[in-house]
């Protein structure tokens, strides 16, 4: 269950998707 809003405010998940890009 990984939301597509990594850099939005999901610090719980590892920034490996849109956050790392």
Curated annotation (Swiss-Prot):
GO terms for cellular component: extracellular region. The modification Sulfotyrosine is found at residue 6. Coiled coil: none annotated. Residues 1-11 have a biased composition (Acidic residues). Residues 1-21 are annotated as: Disordered. It is found in: Secreted. Its main location: secreted. Conversion of fibrinogen to fibrin is triggered by thrombin, which cleaves fibrinopeptides A and B from alpha and beta chains, and thus exposes the N-terminal polymerization sites responsible for the formation of the soft clot. One of its GO terms (biological process) is blood coagulation. Keywords: Adaptive immunity, Blood coagulation, Coiled coil, Disulfide bond, Hemostasis, Immunity, Innate immunity, Secreted, Sulfation. Cleaved by the protease thrombin to yield monomers which, together with fibrinogen alpha (FGA) and fibrinogen gamma (FGG), polymerize to form an insoluble fibrin matrix. Fibrin has a major function in hemostasis as one of the primary components of blood clots. In addition, functions during the early stages of wound repair to stabilize the lesion and guide cell migration during re-epithelialization. Was originally thought to be essential for platelet aggregation, based on in vitro studies using anticoagulated blood. A long coiled coil structure formed by 3 polypeptide chains connects the central nodule to the C-terminal domains (distal nodules). The long C-terminal ends of the alpha chains fold back, contributing a fourth strand to the coiled coil structure. Heterohexamer; disulfide linked. Contains 2 sets of 3 non-identical chains (alpha, beta and gamma). The 2 heterotrimers are in head to head conformation with the N-termini in a small central domain. This is Fibrinogen beta chain. The lineage of its organism: Eukaryota, Metazoa, Chordata, Craniata, Vertebrata.
């Amino acid at each position: 269950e990984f939301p597509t809003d990594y850099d939005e405010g999901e610090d719980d998940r590892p920034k490996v998707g849109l956050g790392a890009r």
